[in-house]
Amino acid sequence: MAKQSMKARDVKRVKLAEKFYTKRVELKKIISDVNASDEDRWDAVLKLQTLPRDSSPSRQRNRCRQTGRPHGVLRKFGLSRIKVREAAMRGEIPGLKKASW
């Protein structure tokens, strides 16, 4: 089990990313615009740097919904590989069965 503080930190990052999403997209659009003046682009870079670090979506971590485990998380289920296996063995995931060949 992950610490509660780590889970809370990830929740905070998700909220910040949602809050600053539009502003971040607008600034990145200005920065990548070739027709914009150098001053405008530089101002956009500086404004982007003033945004909170945790507002960047790349700082979010996929975590298991049940345990909070950060590694081995399957996106399709939102669970770690361990919890997916346990649920599959109990027959709780429809259409998922153990491989046999």
From Swiss-Prot:
Classification via PROSITE patterns: RIBOSOMAL_S14
GO molecular function: rRNA binding; structural constituent of ribosome
Family the UniProt entry places it in: Belongs to the universal ribosomal protein uS14 family.
Role description: Binds 16S rRNA, required for the assembly of 30S particles and may also be responsible for determining the conformation of the 16S rRNA at the A site.
Organism, scientific name: Haemophilus influenzae (strain PittGG)
SUBUNIT field: Part of the 30S ribosomal subunit. Contacts proteins S3 and S10.
Gene this chain is encoded by: rpsN
GO biological process, one term: translation
UniProt GO cellular component terms: cytoplasm; small ribosomal subunit
UniProt-recorded name of the protein: Small ribosomal subunit protein uS14
Coiled coil (UniProt feature): none
Highest taxon above the source species: Bacteria
Keyword vocabulary terms for this entry: Ribonucleoprotein, Ribosomal protein, RNA-binding, rRNA-binding
Entries under InterPro entries matching the protein: Ribosomal_uS14, Ribosomal_uS14_bac/plastid, Ribosomal_uS14_CS
